[in-house]
């Protein structure tokens, strides 16, 4: 445990918040894309589909690198049990709160919008369970994965810490080229695991909890660990915060490959396995692109940025049902996809900010949506 706090990483705080808020245009553009979703516009937009695909191809990979970075930073600051408790509470409590308050009403709304209420009694017990797993976890899946990664990383982080204490500090002798090869092989390994499961027991890939707990965790654990390693080795972090033309070009080529796979791939063939390899390496390269841009443009303290950093999780949690409501009841009345997209951003962001301000004034809701216990008056006085 370290009593010396690490310097504030303003650009990482900002990037994490903007990646979270990017979920709003991502889901609104999904309404107007060629991808089949809960709600879709009458005519899809090719440029909103392209925009949606671009966000989807890298956003969460970069997010989990930042999560791993901050998780290990806090691991060094707190005793093990307290670290695990704090980390799990910060993500677990908002997730458990959002299920009855957000995703359950969202599920009921979709049952009526898609006229599936009459079919519900005819479903088997497993079909009901699996439907609820997909619909109630919904956009909260990354919080569940963070709880799992926090628990799994106890042993890994402990090993990292012991190595730091017993070994002499030395640079992380690994180039971006070598990292790219490692992540390519990790993508191949993930693809092989998925293909084996597809051959042996394909039905399990449609199981919601298996997808969230096993498949998503397996895919994102390398990025989470990479974030921790970036904290341990400043020279590794410097590789990500220094612009790399190779990473930028590589990410562009990978995105083109991603689009071609989406266009010509088949789910019954190798489409998903190919996508996992592409998004694994593209995610790594986009860490460099996003970190270097963020380090140059966002590495400063600002009251406005701090506001959105603090608000980003709440806004992300509430934006999904608001987006679906907009798509179901307002989108059909707007003929222009561009105007509909812009109206959706204003509608969702505006209501989300109002709800955020309301919840700040209700201590119970503030705790439930942040996982942070209220600060005692004595503590405030001591700090101030």
From Swiss-Prot:
One of its GO terms (biological process) is glucan biosynthetic process. It holds the Pfam family Acyl_transf_3. GO terms for molecular function: acyltransferase activity, transferring groups other than amino-acyl groups; transferase activity, transferring one-carbon groups. Its EC number is 2.1.-.-. Keywords: Acyltransferase, Cell membrane, Membrane, Transferase, Transmembrane, Transmembrane helix. The chain crosses the membrane at residues 17-37, 54-74, 91-111, 140-160, 173-193, 212-232, 240-260, 274-294, 311-331, 338-358. Its main location: membrane. It is a multi-pass membrane protein. It is found in: Cell membrane. The keyword Transmembrane applies. Pathway: Glycan metabolism; osmoregulated periplasmic glucan (OPG) biosynthesis. It comes from the Bacteria. This is Glucans biosynthesis protein C. It comes from Salmonella paratyphi B (strain ATCC BAA-1250 / SPB7).
């Amino acid at each position: 445990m370290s009593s010396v706090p690490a310097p504030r990483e303003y650009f990482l705080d900002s990037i994490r918040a903007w990646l979270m808020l990017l979920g709003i245009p991502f889901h609104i553009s999904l309404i107007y894309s060629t991808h089949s979703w809960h709600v879709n516009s009458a005519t899809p937009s090719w440029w909103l589909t392209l925009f949606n695909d671009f966000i989807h191809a890298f956003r969460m990979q970069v997010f989990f690198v930042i999560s791993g970075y901050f998780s290990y930073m806090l691991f060094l600051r707190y005793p093990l049990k307290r670290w695990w408790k704090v980390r799990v509470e910060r993500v677990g409590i908002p997730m458990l709160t959002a299920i009855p308050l957000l995703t359950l009403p969202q599920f009921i709304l979709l049952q009526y919008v898609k006229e599936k209420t009459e079919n519900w009694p005819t479903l088997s017990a497993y079909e009901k369970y699996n439907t609820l797993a997909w619909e109630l976890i919904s956009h909260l899946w990354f919080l569940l994965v963070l709880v799992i990664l926090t628990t799994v990383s106890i042993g890994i982080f402990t090993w990292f810490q012991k190595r730091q204490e017993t070994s002499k500090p030395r640079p992380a002798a690994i180039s971006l080229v070598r990292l790219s090869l490692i992540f390519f092989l990790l993508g191949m390994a993930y693809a092989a695991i998925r293909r084996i499961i597809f051959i042996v027991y394909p039905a399990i890939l449609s199981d919601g909890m298996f997808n969230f707990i096993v498949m998503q965790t397996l895919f994102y654990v390398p990025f989470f660990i990479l974030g921790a390693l970036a904290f341990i080795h400043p020279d590794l972090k410097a590789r990500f915060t220094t612009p790399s033309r190779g990473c930028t070009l590589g990410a562009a080529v990978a995105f083109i490959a991603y689009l071609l796979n989406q266009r010509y791939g088949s789910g019954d063939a190798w489409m998903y396995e190919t996508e996992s390899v592409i998004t694994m390496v593209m995610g790594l390269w986009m860490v460099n692109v996003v970190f270097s841009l963020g380090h140059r443009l966002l590495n400063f303290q600002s009251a406005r940025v701090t506001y959105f950093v603090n608000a980003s999780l709440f806004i992300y949690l509430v934006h999904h049902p608001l987006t679906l409501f907009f798509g179901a009841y307002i989108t059909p009345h707007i003929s222009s996809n561009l105007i509909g997209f812009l109206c959706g951003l204003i509608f969702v962001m505006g209501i989300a900010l109002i709800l955020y301000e309301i919840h700040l004034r209700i201590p119970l809701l503030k705790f439930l949506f942040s996982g942070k216990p209220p600060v005692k008056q004595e503590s405030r006085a001591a700090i101030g």
